[in-house]
Amino acid sequence: MHKSNCFDTARLVAAMMVLVSHHYALSGQPEPYLFGFESAGGIAVIIFFSISGYLISKSAIRSDSFIDFMAKRARRIFPALVPCSILTYFLFGWILNDFSAEYFSHDIVRKTISSIFMSQAPDADITSHLIHAGINGSLWTLPLEFLCYIITGVAVAHLKNGKAFIVILLVFVSLSLIGSVSENRDVMFSIPLWLYPLRGLAFFFGATMAMYEKSWNVSNVKITVVSLLAMYAYASYGKGIDYTMTCYILVSFSTIAICTSVGDPLVKGRFDYSYGVYIYAFPVQQVVINTLHMGFYPSMLLSAVTVLFLSHLSWNLVEKRFLTRSSPKLSLD
């Protein structure tokens, strides 16, 4: 799976894009917005969801059952999330509150458990004094992605019908269009409802590409599709949902097209630090920015080095052990 693609490197780059983008926001500056479309971090999330949809759908096809498939997904998400949640609230949060004994009166245990179950409890009571409130704002995408796993598991691992992804993709396209004109801003499971359809679209676009790979995985087809999408995006710039939807599809298709065209000289399946970088970056950056008071770029560099070290520990001490336990051959799907 790793010899002729660069999915692992792409995920690591996307995780670092989130770190860089968030560093602006956490420092009280506007995040860099690219092409009037999304922040750098937002584009990174699209990359994550596209790759996840592509790889996870293939994992579902190979799985023996829905339970087998979801067990694999749980082993990928929760083992690393548990220590991260504990460190976030019992160490990083405590540091951010000057090691105050009163800090632990703010339902820290409940907040930690909520984080482990991907349902973040309100944390304004422990972070309102920071430049940008929030203890780990990146985790909002996890329940969203896990719901995509469940839908994928039902559609493929249980029904064994890859064609279901076309229907699911069309549903998410429709929901994205409806959400773009709706004034509903309700929140469910800590997620603003309007954020889900477009991210889900990226996931299931990647999944659909995986199911019909033979029809597009040719250099001429890839170049033609990317060129047409890019031209249409340019022509529709400033036209609201028309431009946004085109850009989501363009980023999703381009991500999969590039990753399946380029080899991986860096990672080659040896490790996957991207998840660790993603879940540890936000709280580490909060600590560095709000306690060390360094310059913008030095604090970004220190955050990146610290996060890469923590992700290295997370991979080698936790994640890899649970992934190899499921199979004699390491799988990063």
Curated annotation (Swiss-Prot):
GO molecular function: acyltransferase activity, transferring groups other than amino-acyl groups
GO BP of this protein: polysaccharide biosynthetic process
Primary location group: host cell
EC numbers, comma separated: 2.3.1.-
Similarity section: Belongs to the acyltransferase 3 family.
Top enzyme class: transferase
GO-annotated cellular components: host cell plasma membrane; membrane
Subcellular location: Host cell inner membrane
InterPro entries, alphabetized: Acyl_transf_3_dom, Acyltransferase_3
Annotated keywords: Acyltransferase, Host cell inner membrane, Host cell membrane, Host membrane, Membrane, Transferase
Membrane topology: Peripheral membrane protein
Protein name stated in the entry: O-acetyl transferase
The organism's taxonomic lineage, starting at the top: Viruses, Duplodnaviria, Heunggongvirae, Uroviricota, Caudoviricetes
General function of this protein: Antigenically converts S.flexneri serotype X to 3a, Y to 3b, 1a to 1b and 4a to 4b by O-acetylating the O-antigenic polysaccharide chain.
